[in-house]
From Swiss-Prot:
Organism: Sus scrofa (Pig)
Residues with the N-acetylmethionine modification: 1
Entries under InterPro entries matching the protein: Leu-rich_rpt, Leu-rich_rpt_Cys-con_subtyp, LRR_dom_sf, LRR_RI_cap, NLRP_innate_immun_reg
Localization (cell): Cytoplasm; Nucleus
Main location, first listed in the record: cytoplasm
Intrachain disulfide bonds: none
Name of the protein this chain belongs to: Ribonuclease inhibitor
Function recorded in the entry: Ribonuclease inhibitor which inhibits RNASE1, RNASE2 and angiogenin (ANG). May play a role in redox homeostasis. Required to inhibit the cytotoxic tRNA ribonuclease activity of ANG in the cytoplasm in absence of stress. Relocates to the nucleus in response to stress, relieving inhibition of ANG in the cytoplasm, and inhibiting the angiogenic activity of ANG in the nucleus.
GO terms under cellular component: angiogenin-PRI complex; cytoplasm; lamellipodium; nucleoplasm; nucleus; plasma membrane
SUPFAM superfamilies documented for this protein: RNI-like (SSF52047)
GO biological process, one term: cell migration
Annotated SMART domains: LRR_CC, LRR_RI
Length: 456
C-alpha cells in the first residue's frame, strides 16, 4: 500500500489523521508538504512501529539537520527493511551529516539514497563516504546533485568506487568538481573493483582534457551503460578524445548524453563512426549543440548504416533548418530502429514539416515519438500533420508545443484524432491557445477516446 501526498500544506487535523498510516504503509511519500522538525518527532516514532516500510520520500520539506536526525533515528530499528530513502532539498547541511555513517551501517537493506539539493559540502560528503565504505552498506544508487561539492570530494568518492562493487548508479551533476576533481574521480572509476553502470557528471566543469581519462574508462569498464556529460565544455577536441573509448570492443554503453557540450558538425564526424560501429548504443542526446544542417546530414547517413541500432536521438536546439529535412526524411523511411526523434527548437518551418510528414506517411516507418515544439509550424503545417496522423500507424506521441498554431490548425489535428483509424495516444500542445468552441470539441474527443491524452 502507498501513501502518496504532494504539495499539500498539512493542517494539524490532517497530520493527526495521517500518523496511523505512517505505521502501516510500505511506501510513504510526503513531498513538499510543509513538514518541519516538529513533524519529524512524529515521523520517527511512526517509522519505528512500521516494519513494512520499503520507501520513504520527504523531498522539499524544511526538516533541517535536527529533523533529518530524528527521521534517521526512526529508521534505525532492527525490523526496518527500507530500500529507498529520498531526502532531496530537506535543508540537510554538513553539520547534520554526522549521523550518516551509523545510519548506512544499520540499514543493510537500503539500496537508493537521494540527497540532492542539500548543501552538504565536502566535509559532509566525507562523512557520507565513511558510511558507504562500511561492509554492512549495500547501497546501489546515490544522487548528489547541487550539494556544493568541489574537487575535494572526489578522492572520498573514488575510494568508495574502488572499495565497493555494490554501487551501480552515481549522480554528482551540478557540482563544481572541475577538471582536477574529475581526474581524481576517474581513478576510482578505472579500478577493476568498480561496477558502476550509470555515471552522471552534467555541468561539473569538465574540459576536453578530461576526455582522455573518460576514453580509458569507457574502453575498460564493460559494466558502464549510461554516461551523462551534458553542459560541459568538451568541444570537438574532447569528443575526438572520447570516441576511441566508445569504439572499444569492451564498451557496452547504451546511453550517451552530450547536450550543450560545444560540439559542431566536426565533432559529429567522430560520433558518427561510433554510431555506425556500436550496435549497443541506443540513446544519444546532442541537444543544444550547433551541429547545423551538415551535422544533421552526417547523423542521418550514419543512421542508415546496418551497424547503427540507435533508438532515441535528441537534436533539440541544434541550429537545424528546413534544408536538413531531406536527409532526415530519407533516414526515417529506411531506418527501422529509431523510435524517438527530438527536433524541437529548430527552424524547420512548414516546408520542413511537410517533407517529414511525407516520409512518415510511407508504409513501414517505425517512429513512435516525434517532438516538433518551437519549430515555426503554423496552421498550414498542421494540414500535413493531420494527414500524417491518418496515414501513420506507428506514431504514438507528437509534441507541437510553442508553435504559431491557432484554431484552424488545432481543428485540423482534432479532425484526424477523431477518426477511429488514428493511432496517436498523446498530443502535447503547451503554449498553444484556442477558443472555447475548440475546447468543447477537445473535451468531447477525450471522452470518446479514453486512450488519448491532449496535454496543454
Amino acid at each position: 500500500m502507498n501513501l502518496d501526498i504532494h504539495c499539500e500544506q498539512l493542517s494539524d487535523a490532517r497530520w493527526t489523521e495521517l500518523l496511523p498510516l505512517l505505521q502501516q504503509y510500505e511506501v510513504v511519500r510526503l513531498d513538499d508538504c510543509g513538514l518541519t522538525e516538529e513533524h519529524c518527532k512524529d515521523i520517527g516514532s511512526a517509522l519505528r512501529a512500521n516494519p513494512s516500510l520499503t520507501e520513504l520520500c520527504l523531498r522539499t520539506n524544511e526538516l533541517g539537520d535536527a529533523g533529518v536526525h530524528l527521521v534517521l533515528q526512526g529508521l534505525q530499528s532492527p525490523t526496518c527493511k527500507i530500500q529507498k530513502l529520498s531526502l532531496q532539498n530537506c535543508s540537510l547541511t554538513e553539520a547534520g551529516c554526522g549521523v550518516l555513517p551509523s545510519t548506512l551501517r544499520s540499514l543493510p537493506t537500503l539500496r537508493e539514497l537521494h540527497l540532492s539539493d542539500n548543501p552538504l559540502g565536502d566535509a559532509g560528503l566525507r562523512l557520507l563516504c565513511e558510511g558507504l565504505l562500511d561492509p554492512q552498506c549495500h547501497l546501489e544508487k546515490l544522487q548528489l546533485e547541487y550539494c556544493r561539492l568541489t574537487a575535494a570530494s572526489c578522492e572520498p568518492l573514488a575510494s568508495v568506487l574502488r572499495a565497493t562493487r555494490a554501487l551501480k548508479e552515481l549522480t554528482v551533476s551540478n557540482n563544481d568538481i572541475g577538471e582536477a576533481g574529475a581526474r581524481v574521480l576517474g581513478q576510482g572509476l578505472a579500478d577493476s573493483a568498480c561496477q558502476l553502470e550509470t555515471l552522471r557528471l552534467e555541468n561539473c566543469g569538465l574540459t576536453p582534457a578530461n576526455c582522455k581519462d573518460l576514453c580509458g574508462i569507457v574502453a575498460s569498464q564493460a559494466s558502464l551503460r549510461e554516461l551523462d556529460l551534458g553542459s560541459n565544455g568538451l568541444g570537438d577536441a574532447g569528443i575526438a578524445e572520447l570516441c576511441p573509448g566508445l569504439l572499444s570492443p569492451a564498451s557496452r554503453l547504451k546511453t550517451l548524453w552530450l547536450w550543450e557540450c560545444d560540439i559542431t558538425a566536426s565533432g559529429c564526424r567522430d560520433l558518427c563512426r561510433v554510431l555506425q560501429a556500436k550496435e549497443t548504443l541506443k540513446e544519444l542526446s546532442l541537444a543544444g549543440n550547433k551541429l547545423g544542417d551538415e551535422g544533421a546530414r552526417l547523423l542521418c547517413e550514419s543512421l542508415l548504416q546496418p551497424g547503427c541500432q540507435l533508438e532515441s536521438l535528441w537534436v533539440k536546439s541544434c541550429s537545424l533548418t528546413a534544408a536538413c529535412c531531406q536527409h532526415v526524411s530519407l533516414m526515417l523511411t529506411q531506418n527501422k530502429h529509431l523510435l524517438e526523434l527530438q527536433l524541437s527548437s529548430n527552424k524547420l518551418g512548414d516546408s520542413g514539416i511537410q517533407e517529414l510528414c511525407q516520409a512518415l506517411s510511407q508504409p513501414g516507418t517505425t517512429l513512435r515519438v516525434l517532438c516538433l515544439g518551437d519549430c515555426e509550424v503554423t496552421n498550414s503545417g498542421c494540414s500535413s500533420l493531420a494527414s500524417l496522423l491518418l496515414a501513420n500507424r506507428s506514431l504514438r506521441e507528437l509534441d507541437l508545443s510553442n508553435n504559431c498554431v491557432g484554431d484552424p490548425g488545432v481543428l485540423q489535428l482534432l479532425g484526424s484524432l477523431e477518426q477511429p483509424g488514428c493511432a496517436l495516444e498523446q498530443l502535447v500542445l503547451y503554449d498553444t491557445y484556442w477558443t472555447e468552441e475548440v475546447e468543447d470539441r477537445l473535451q468531447a474527443l477525450e471522452g470518446s477516446k479514453p486512450g488519448l491524452r491532449v496535454i496543454s
